[in-house]
Amino acid sequence: MHGFMTLFKKEILRFWKVAFQTVMAPVLTALLYQLIFSHVLSQHVEAYPGVSYTAFLIPGLAMMSMAQNAFANSSSSLIQSKITGNIVFLLLPPLTALEFFAAYLLAAVVRGVVVGAGVLAVTSWFGLLLPAHPLWVLVFAVFGCGVLGTLGIVAGIWADKFDQLAAFQNFLIMPLTFLSGVFYSINSLPPLWKTVSHLNPVFYMIDGFRYGFFGQGDVSPWLSLAVVAGSFALLAGWSLHLIASGYKLRQ
């Protein structure tokens, strides 16, 4: 437990010491999205009955920012440690695979939640959102960050250089987040693309998180929870296997 806490604190300090880059920058990016899309589309789109498009955007942008930053936190830390050789100082102490995994995962969740809170704070002047179901908001915030944080661990272990990690982000994370209903309700899509959206686990994170605010979504929150929790379990098992085997860490 002492080893876990030490590594966890180290990961928290790693992103907090450069909070202007790791927290404020993504919050500013989300604010710009909010300004542009709400200005252009707020008078033309009503995603949910009785919910303005401006309000509709806020939870989606918050969850998108949380997911992207949870992934970035764990993946960038691991790849940086591997490239600089500092990973050896994490492998020498008697850390179990579970402690190693939990420290990186929880730090990623913390960064994601902090960024999400910042996005909600700066966009609140567009229309203060009071969650209809706060527990759903909390559950999907934690699980959403958990899924992408775990995927970040897998990517950080797999990648040998920053170019490979960038490809992972550009060709997997970016499409999954942008095509997940952040800027639209999938009920507005043609049948084919609606079906494709249902295959995207990030869609369920965003829809469940949005349900917590408005009490309505494109699918049942219980279905969203099942998909997100199942995705987390699969990725966590894969990540723990990679850590325990020493794949690209001890090899």
Regions found by a protein language model. Name each.
Residues M1-W16, F209:
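A short amphipathic helical element positioned immediately N-terminal to and/or at the very start
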Residues R14-S81, L128-P134, A167, S188, ...:
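Transmembrane helix-boundary elements of multi-pass transport/secretion proteins
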Residues L41, G156-L199, F203:
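Transmembrane helix segments
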Residues A97-Q169, Q216-L240:
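Alpha-helical transmembrane segments and their short interhelical loops
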